[in-house]
């Protein structure tokens, strides 16, 4: 953060309660009275109006004086008004605090400069809001508040903090404003994410709909069906036909003309007034080749890059709009190793109105980008920075294990700090935060991540541990010191994590979640809760931080011995506490809306259901399911694993072994599944370790597909530490995580796999009930790849 000038008073930048005043000092309040009124600019925005009210309320809380508008008052604190004597244009993101005579002016550049500067002023008084629940640090009461002559300019290190979140309640909006968070739509005009079929809709996805990762069209184009009227706008597939499953045909000049016309339609429809704003041109969220047509491939050769046609399209759009809209910047993402992760190698400089956002989704999520293991992911960001005026950085603040997504038992604070500082050194001046870094859930250390990001966006060099202490003192009160030690231990574990931690691992593969560690941490939380007894606010904050731990205990329960389980005080106690925390959290999030009982009830239920989508299957598994068929009784050790369906919950089905199932489409093909392993440093990182197993219609014809659950033996194979039995043919990113069963002391041990499936007689649906895995007392040949040991064997247990 750059600061030019200071509050000209002795103690720091503001003096509160001074016993004597200099001639140039401004006495804001004395003895509970003030001559000052806080005045907003004419026609303030909602955020500016709310910030001015915050300023009045906070000054009154500190001094006891009323800073409301009163015609008898002769002195003013103006919000959003630039004094006539200040002729210097504001830089991007700059905020200024200036005194002219007895008046004070707070003003800034950009959509939220005038409200952000209010919180610069309040922060210098010692005011911090640290989370959406209202926890804060405020100075002691000051009957006399004096400041010196003011002349200060602040340019935040990273002016724009935005992400995958919008506020649904007033107190969430309040927190966003106080921390300087931009709502998702604040910075963008019309389009903020993947834009291909949103701007050039195929007609296959209705307005408001979504298929996979592709959303339906903007409202301006909801009646368009370009795949019918202009199929040439879409990529040519590998087999010579146009398809909506790849990207747009970005080399097509008619497509470019239509795209440009549609951008103009959006700008007009959104009443774009020429202010600083961004428009996303990001391609659709499909991996692989963009287009197989000869013109696109010619541009790939020209740019020496697989995204050559797309880059050429981007640069064309920049040329078309540069002069007419000088403050409009086009955004795109450096995303996916086989697409835009790396810049075009011969490009010397990006257009002035082009900004790329770097998305390091494939890096090791237990280490920062500055760690040697992530060198291959750090270099593309550095290469983009060399040709860019500025960058956007996508923040993935935590791992996203399936199916719990944003709630893993991790710290991921220091890694976040290191990544932000590395991105800043490489010209990142905007950050886009993915799940787990927005003020919409408060479990684990999510709120700390949000606050840390906000503080570092203001001042990238601010001390990390000071921020942690400031946050924890406010949130956990007497338990702050113990919470800091808990965080430090998790940080130490992550720093020494032995495996490459991908972005979406199986939660059960996280090695630090041993029964001994889980028990010790649970007992630590018991002690912390005893320290805050009598403070409902501190207790709720502790329970939120404890939720990730409780969830992991439930997930690991079937893998503990009975002796270990007995030490936790009962499974149902852990389940009740975890589920109770979800409800208490949701009610806190939507507090203040109880006057709309149906809305409040629906929102609370929806939030709880979203969080429980991953938890419920671990609860079901921990409680135990229906008995297995008698054929399994002869085995001493049997592991039962429920399916996961990406980040979605499972379907309820009383006939399923655990009452839950993954319902998907019938694939109507020969092969349904394969064992996939994640291998760091290999392209592609995911590889199939065995040929697809023959579980298609040919096999099912031997047994009647009667819609009932049946157990099919797949065969025996060894596994590796990060492996998944993949059923993506049934539903995207679905299957069974099996890597947690790997034993490094016996790496070639064979496991027998049996899958429980119900198949619709009419071949419309398939239901996955569970996977049964049996460790065998024999090994595969040393060095052998994971694979079937018996040719084409699929047995059926009725």
Region roles according to the model:
Residues 34, 51-54, 58, 92-315, ...:
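Feature activates predominantly on carbohydrate-active enzymes
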